[in-house]
């Protein structure tokens, strides 16, 4: 009988399953990610596949970093695979490390540097539990013009924030937010996925991670409501949080269009009404792109421990490691 113990927290409503696996081999985090894909995928399946998980299940594997600048290494996964970066999971992990005492709490904000396949990200957790993430450089890749069966021609703005997203501005397209459901947006993402992926491959080396459907709901203060769909075209998943990497990509897009200024806060509201605050704290260059340095934070404490759990796989279980969650 195989068993696996983990800690579960949620950040703004989105779960994070934390498992510790020191000693994952690899000279850098991308090699460690590749090792996990080949040798430790059973961990991902046990923690994100039904019947031991749900469509919202997300995980982070904590291991040793390669860089002397980082405190720990982090590898991210969901039911669709292993990924380079996750903002909500990084923030949830940082909060757990501080609250559990695994990282000594500082008198003010406690700083933690995570090494991820996307790069090193900096987190701080203050005494109230508020967590702030300074993410990897984020930038706009370009636009993809595609046709949908229900809404006609659409412009999808491709932006990177640790993962690559297609940003669909419903205001820009004249789509009434009240007239469209989350299920319809999930179906739309599935329809657009392959077409947008083809455009993305011609513009950058990153694989499309998901779609962010957004609508401006306030100018002062600047607020955006967003639905983030990720996973795969066949099995789209819904982010319950405002998404750290999605908000970073969104910030890069807004900044490139002049909709937000440097150091100006933007409030990002999730599908369930939880919020992240984001702002551009700097400009930088990343490979061939002009990029921004995004800072994403919770307005107050938003990360909570929900479970200390052990999942079990009996040798005669006909479903084995499980099956991918059913679509939205």
Report residues per predicted region.
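Glycine-rich ThDP/TPP pyrophosphate-binding loop and its adjacent helix/strand module
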Residues: 162
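A glycine-rich beta-to-alpha transition motif near the start of alpha/beta enzyme domains, typified by
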Residues: 1-158, 166-328
């Amino acid at each position: 009988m195989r068993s696996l113990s983990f800690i579960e927290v949620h950040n703004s409503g989105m779960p994070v399953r934390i498992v510790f696996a020191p000693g994952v081999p690899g000279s850098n985090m991308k090699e460690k990610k590749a090792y996990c894909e080949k040798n430790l995928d059973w961990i991902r399946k046990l923690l994100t596949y039904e019947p031991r998980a749900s469509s919202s299940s997300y995980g982070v594997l904590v291991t040793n970093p390669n860089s002397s600048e980082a405190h720990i290494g982090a590898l991210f996964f969901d039911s669709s695979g292993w990924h380079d970066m996750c903002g909500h999971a990084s923030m949830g992990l940082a909060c757990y490390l501080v609250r559990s005492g695994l990282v000594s709490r500082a008198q003010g904000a406690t700083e933690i540097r995570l090494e991820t396949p996307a790069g090193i990200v900096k987190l701080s957790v203050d005494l109230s539990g508020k967590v702030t993430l300074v993410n990897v450089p984020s930038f706009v890749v370009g636009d993809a013009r595609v046709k949908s069966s229900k809404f006609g021609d659409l412009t999808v703005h491709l932006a990177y924030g640790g993962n690559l997203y297609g940003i669909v501005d419903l205001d820009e397209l004249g789509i009434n937010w009240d007239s469209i459901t989350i299920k319809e947006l999930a179906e739309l993402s599935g329809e657009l996925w392959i077409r947008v992926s083809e455009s993305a491959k011609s513009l950058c080396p990153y694989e499309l991670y998901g779609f962010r459907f957004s609508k401006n709901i306030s100018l002062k203060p600047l607020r955006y409501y967003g639905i983030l769909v990720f996973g795969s075209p066949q099995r789209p998943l819904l982010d319950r949080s405002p998404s750290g990497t999605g908000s970073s990509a969104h910030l890069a897009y807004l900044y490139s269009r002049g909709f937000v200024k440097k150091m100006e806060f933007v409030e990002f509201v999730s599908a369930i009404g939880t919020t992240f605050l984001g702002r551009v704290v700097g400009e930088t260059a990343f490979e061939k792109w002009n990029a921004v340095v995004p800072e994403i934070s919770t307005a107050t404490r938003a990360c909570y421990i929900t479970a200390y759990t052990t999942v079990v796989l009996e040798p005669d279980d006909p479903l084995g490691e499980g099956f991918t969650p059913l679509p939205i």
